Amino acid sequence: MLRSNVSRIDPKRRNVLDHRKKQFAEAAYKDTDYPHRLNFYSTPPTADITIEQFEQWAIDRLRILAELEACSFRNKTPAETASHMKPLLDKYLPLDTNSSSSSQLFAQRQKDHYSHFILRLAFASTEDLRRRFTRVETMLFRMRLNADDGRERAAFINSLNLDWETVSDEEKRELAAELAATASFGGYKKGQQQQQQYEEDQQTWCKVSWLRVPELVEQRRVFLRQGYAYVPAREQQAMVVSEFSSRLERQLELTARALPRLDEDDRLTPILAHLSKNFITPDASYVGTSSAISSADISARNIDTLVNNHHFPACMSHLHRTLRRDAHLKHYGRLQYTLFLKGIGLNLEECLLFWRQSFNKITDDTFNKEYRYNVRHTYGDVGGDSNRRGGGYSPYSCQKILTEHPPGPGEAHGCPYRHFNMENLQTLLQQGMGVTDRGVLNGVKEDKEKQKFHMACNRVFEHLHKEELKKAKDEGIMTAAQLETIVHPNEYFKRSYLLKNMGKMQGDVKMEG
């Protein structure tokens, strides 16, 4: 009989290994070079960086993305956005061209590379974060692509190995008339720049399946033949941006599926959680009562007066009037309105008094059992340590109101400019806010149809405060920066209150820019 070898591994137990360690046991570490200013972020970085770099680089990129999102909310044009973002990019996320011969090229591109992937980890967890991250990263990529040197841009696009086929000179000669007609349909105006663009189009055409460029087909900006779309140079940048966006969407989904299996460093988890929670626009970061006006009298007894003086935006005016009519609001309506009142400076004691007086069809016992705790929780008076330390919840921004928890039957929360039909919206504006000017109402209708809900709200604000705005501009009380598009209900209140009380509170009106 043969003796068994006691040192031999039991075959049944041979593969019982930690799958996480096995998964990453043979990671391929390699140095990354950055031949191009732009990046499709196809390859994750593998070199070591410090925990301080990890956090600071992510925060710097987050500043850029948040400000880009704010520009889109204010409906700035691409040129206005580029002008606004240039000093911020130079400060937080500079990217010099190869022709600049800067000694900082590698460091700049490494920071850009790493910061993208750090935020990708932070924002892959939910569909909403993935969608927002893709949108603002695409905005950043488009802006950089448009600003890139022509030769460097062409070299970068060629390096991507996109599934394009360059149209040969022979084929261009064969289709010269059709391609010329397509180019002229795009609309060239006289001028040196337009002539250069026309000549460039004549030199560089590519063809792809028409299914990849349905927007260009719809706009008749390409020539179609045998299932292929012939795309001129001026439209190829749009195709690159579209490819960047679609790839990033797919990669974020893969990242989301991998998150539960990642053996993350315990030091990184709280950083990633903090980054995702703070992915908000600078104008939307109202924490606690930071939007409150110190000298304003905000109490339960004068909320009706503030509403009647048109200091509340349409969303909050509708919630208030619904509350007064029904003596009740459903959960999301109570939450949205409570946080707004908290943000304008209504303290917890007064807020509890306001809700108790408003819910006048129920007993004290019912109110204390069903509603009192929730109000205290939003103020950070009860709940876990983190809730109390953080002062409870922050007031909702326009973006949050527009994108989260759309109202259902019997609910009054949300944004009237988005969630109301036009008839109900006009009734609210006319009867609830005193907007009767036909031109303003028609403008609101056009804004709503174009889904420019922020513009509709600001149009109403400017109409209701036109005299005060003129005085503030004429006397230099507020700068242009302080009068930019409102993207937060609490900013609406603050600006309205200060404008209506300019003569009484000059100190408060001089807001920080």
From Swiss-Prot:
Note on cofactor: Binds 1 [4Fe-4S] cluster.
Pfam families: DNA_primase_lrg
Cofactor(s) required for function per UniProt: [4Fe-4S] cluster
Source species, domain of life: Eukaryota
GO molecular function annotations of the record: 4 iron, 4 sulfur cluster binding; DNA-directed RNA polymerase activity; metal ion binding; single-stranded DNA binding
Role noted for this protein: DNA primase is the polymerase that synthesizes small RNA primers for the Okazaki fragments made during discontinuous DNA replication.
Entry's family note: Belongs to the eukaryotic-type primase large subunit family.
Subunit-level organization: Heterodimer of a small subunit and a large subunit.
Protein name: Probable DNA primase large subunit
Gene source species: Neurospora crassa (strain ATCC 24698 / 74-OR23-1A / CBS 708.71 / DSM 1257 / FGSC 987)
